[in-house]
Amino acid sequence: MLLVVSTALCVVLLDGLLWLAHPLPSGQSARWIWKHDIAGVKQEVVFEKYHDLRGLSWTANSSLQKPPGTFRILIVGASTTESSQQEPKDAWWGLLEKRLQQQPELAGKAVQILAFGQGGFEVSDINTWLKHELHELNPDLLITLVGVNDVAFPEHSDSDLPGIYRLRGFLRKVSQIYRHASAIKLKWEVARGLAVKWITARDLKDLAGKLRALPLSEPASRNPDPLPRFVAGLHSIISLARNNGVPVLLLGQPVLWKDQVTPDEDSVRWFRHYEGSEASRASGAWMYHEMQRFNDAQRKAAAETGSCFLNLDEVIPKSLEVYYDDCHYTDAGSVEVAEAVFPAMFECLHRK
């Protein structure tokens, strides 16, 4: 018992000394260079990202608290928002920010887009993240790009996220020891190339090969059906945004999948789908119609709640010039997405 009390007192004293002598801000960031070989994107990426479970990316550094006179948009999603194979300025949201900064009606304001995405995240994961970050970030508009992981990987478990987020959120507010440990961990991850889940052309080829080895399954209905959980997550995000006075633009997920997939297009596919815990392979046509079902659910949720909606899958070309796999964008693809989102975003802001 004495050892426990002594250790606790030492921790408190050390934390107090760090607050006085060497305080670190909450939410560390890092910048590093990565080289890769994926077709359609630049071969050298300068990447910058917040650490400490915030996972935010940006084109120019900024405090988490919105500066006065700033027009801030928060974009949330999974890997197609994280855009880890691109520099922030080449990602679709970076291009969108550049367009916004050139608009006369926003003259005199600093325009900023913060993007949060993490590979594999589903709507429920994003909802959990927003519950802990939306109020502090205080955006003028929330844009979501979700759905493909809910279609393909609904067995992902996020049951531990709320507890982890609450604990880390508390520690980063009160503990300098935690902040210093986070900074050291981030530097170590950057040095070892672990700060982002990078992927190479060989990785993509291996993933595509693993898909071909799976049994073919194209059920008329899925059991369990992941759609109700997806819809519940959407409504939770919209309600959370409304409670914080933030309008929402839902983006339907664009994908390479379509009714007639060419052999070259089929060769880059690696997304599987799950029935229970069993992974299966399906044609591009089956995956396309499943994605349509989820995008239609987003359209319905937007109509029911008075939110804005744009189905990107109806306007983005389905070709290897735009995608380097099932759903991730080349540099040319990011241009297509930014050009499509720009007018829809302005229309949404004018509605609100």
Predicted feature residues:
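Serine-dependent acyl-ester chemistry module
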Residues: 149-299, 305, 317-320
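Membrane/wall-proximal cationic-aromatic binding patches
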Residues: 22-106, 318-320
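Histidine-centered active-site loop/cap adjacent to the catalytic His
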Residues: 2, 230, 300, 305-308, ...
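Hydrophobic membrane-insertion alpha-helices, especially the h-region
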Residues: 2-17
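Second-shell loop/turn segments in exported
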Residues: 79-87, 115-116, 220-227, 284-288, ...
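Extracytoplasmic/secreted envelope proteins and their assembly/folding machinery
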Residues: 93, 97, 127-131, 227, ...
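Conserved SGNH/GDSL esterase-like catalytic core that processes O-acyl groups on lipids
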Residues: 68, 72-75, 80-200
